[in-house]
């Protein structure tokens, strides 16, 4: 009896089930206050779900728990309570392109590294995947593959970080402040690279940032964090135009109280009722 190729069915099921579930997650760290040991809660009862195709942004001021939450989602640290379920492959781009790349590895070796966690890939396929990832971030493999990170600019290093994240063809791309250490011109270039990759690969995006403009330009849905808690969640138009929490109102007002800002982020400002 001959069986039909069911690859298309398998891929369809995968696309429908790829998701990240964060359920009632809490995380504490040891600290010292007034000379006494104490526990500080970095993440406070956080729950959300990212489905296939979602573009999520987690925004908030520095120290609100965003990066800790991202590290929990990635499995780099364990929550003290709560559950994180991950269905699908995850690529990660760290905040610091200078610290996140091994100084003694070439660009090709760095980008190739995640492939060793997948099932066996032959040499020619490995080269193809690495070259495709480098081309996707506009780094010519012939020019850059054998360079060390010390021979790259900050923008080029972050492109290598992105190439390393996408070489496995991830279902989810998690990015922690991916442009915070780059100047404005390079930041825009990286935005454009990320946007094209997310659309082309049809992967979901989880972006951790305090850059309100970036979250508006890159994400469809926003979670607002304050002191480890999610204080507001919704579509970006809702969060920008109809805030329910005082902290969100303060955060958005501070960011948008600049001439031309609404045009910059591509969102129509709601009319203020007299």
Please describe what each predicted stretch is:
Residues 173-176:
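Catalytic Walker B motif of ABC-type/P-loop ATPase nucleotide-binding domains
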Residues 1-10, 138, 241-274:
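C-terminal boundary and immediately downstream tail of ABC-type ATPase nucleotide-binding domains
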Residues 148-152, 156:
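Conserved ABC ATPase signature
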Residues 233-234:
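ABC ATPase "signature
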Residues 215-217:
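A short, surface-exposed alpha-helical micro-motif characterized by mixed small hydrophobic
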Residues 169:
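Conserved catalytic motifs of ABC-family nucleotide-binding domains
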């Amino acid at each position: 009896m001959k069986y039909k190729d069911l690859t298309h069915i398998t891929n369809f099921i995968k696309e429908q089930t790829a998701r990240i579930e964060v359920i009632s997650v809490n995380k504490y760290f040891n600290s010292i206050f007034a000379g006494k040991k104490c526990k500080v809660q970095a993440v406070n009862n956080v729950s959300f779900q990212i489905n296939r195709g979602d573009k999520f942004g987690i925004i908030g001021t520095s120290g609100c728990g965003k990066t800790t939450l991202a590290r929990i989602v990635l499995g780099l640290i364990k929550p003290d309570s709560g559950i994180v379920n991950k269905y699908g492959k995850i690529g990660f781009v760290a905040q610091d392109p200078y610290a996140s790349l091994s100084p003694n590895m070439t660009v090709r070796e760095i980008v190739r590294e995640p492939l060793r966690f997948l099932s066996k890939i032959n040499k020619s396929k490995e080269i193809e995947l690495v070259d495709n990832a480098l081309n996707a971030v506009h780094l010519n493999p012939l020019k850059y593959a054998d360079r060390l990170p010390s021979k790259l600019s900050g923008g080029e290093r972050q492109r290598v970080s992105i190439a390393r994240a996408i070489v496995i063809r991830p279902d989810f791309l998690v990015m922690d402040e991916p442009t915070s250490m780059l100047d404005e011109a390079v930041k825009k270039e990286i935005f454009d690279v990320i946007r094209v990759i997310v659309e082309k690969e049809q992967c979901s995006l989880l972006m951790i940032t305090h850059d309100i403009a970036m979250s508006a330009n890159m994400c469809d849905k926003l979670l607002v964090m304050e002191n480890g808690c999610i204080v507001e969640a919704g579509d970006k138009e809702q969060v920008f135009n109809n805030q329910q929490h005082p902290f969100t109102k303060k955060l958005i007002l501070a960011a948008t109280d600049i001439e031309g800002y609404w045009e910059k982020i591509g969102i129509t400002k709601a009319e203020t009722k007299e």
